[in-house]
Swiss-Prot record:
Active site per the UniProt annotation: 7, 68, 140
Catalytic activity: Endonucleolytic cleavage at a junction such as a reciprocal single-stranded crossover between two homologous DNA duplexes (Holliday junction)
Annotated S-S bridges: none
Highest classification ranks of the organism: Bacteria, Pseudomonadati, Pseudomonadota, Betaproteobacteria, Burkholderiales
GO BP annotations, alphabetical order: DNA recombination; DNA repair
Name assigned to this protein: Crossover junction endodeoxyribonuclease RuvC
PANTHER family linked to this entry: CROSSOVER JUNCTION ENDODEOXYRIBONUCLEASE RUVC
Family as reported in the entry's similarity comment: Belongs to the RuvC family.
C-alpha cells in the first residue's frame, strides 16, 4: 500500500511517500512544495499548493493519504491561513479520489517517537531510523513522512484486531 503524508503550510508544505507491506516500511520520496512569493495574493499561493500536490500525486500515485490537523496558534490569523492552505491540499487529495486520514501533531509524535512532546530533531531522527535512511530529510519532509508512518500504523490496528478475534474464534 502506498501512502502519502502531508505537513501543510502556507509558505512550505512537506510531503512524504512510503510503501507499506505488512510491518515493512519503504521510503519512496519526500520533499516540499512552496507557494511562492508572499507578495503574491492568497488565491495564487493556494493555487500553487494545489497544483504542487497534484503534481506529486501524479508522479507517485499513492493509494491512501494522511494530513496533519491544524493546531490552534497564538495568532488567529496564522491559524486561519494554515487552515486555508490545508483546505487547498485536501481539495487536491480528494480530487484524485484518495481517502484522507487526519492526525494531530501530538498523535504523530507519539506514533513516531513515543511521546507527544517530541522536538522536531527527535522526529527527524526516528523517521531516518524507521525508514533506514542515510540522513534525515528536512523538517517539513520529515514531519510529512511521520504523518504517513503514523497513518500506516493506525491503518494496521483494525486488521490486527480482526485477525486476533478470528484466531480466538477458531481456537474455541
Amino acid at each position: 500500500m502506498r501512502w502519502i503524508g502531508i505537513d501543510p503550510g502556507l509558505r512550505i508544505t512537506g510531503f512524504g511517500v512510503i510503501d507499506v507491506d505488512g510491518q515493512k516500511l519503504t521510503y519512496v520520496a519526500s520533499g516540499t512544495i512552496e507557494s511562492g512569493d508572499p507578495a503574491k495574493g492568497l488565491p495564487e499561493r493556494l493555487g500553487a499548493l494545489y497544483a504542487g500536490v497534484k503534481e506529486v500525486l501524479e508522479t507517485y500515485r499513492p493509494e491512501q493519504a494522511a494530513i496533519e490537523e491544524v493546531f490552534l496558534n497564538v495568532n488567529p490569523r496564522s491559524t486561519l491561513m494554515l487552515g486555508q492552505a490545508r483546505g487547498a491540499v485536501i481539495a487536491a487529495l480528494v480530487s484524485e479520489k484518495l481517502p484522507v486520514a487526519e492526525y494531530s501533531a501530538l498523535r504523530v509524535k507519539q506514533a513516531i517517537v513515543g511521546t507527544g512532546r517530541a522536538a522536531k530533531p527527535q522526529v527527524q531522527e526516528m523517521v531516518k531510523r524507521l525508514l533506514r535512511l542515510s540522513r534525515a530529510p528536512g523538517t517539513d519532509a520529515s514531519d510529512a513522512l511521520g504523518v504517513a508512518i503514523c497513518a500506516a500504523h493506525h491503518s494496521q490496528i483494525p486488521k490486527a484486531i480482526t485477525s486476533a478475534l478470528a484466531s480466538k474464534k477458531r481456537s474455541k
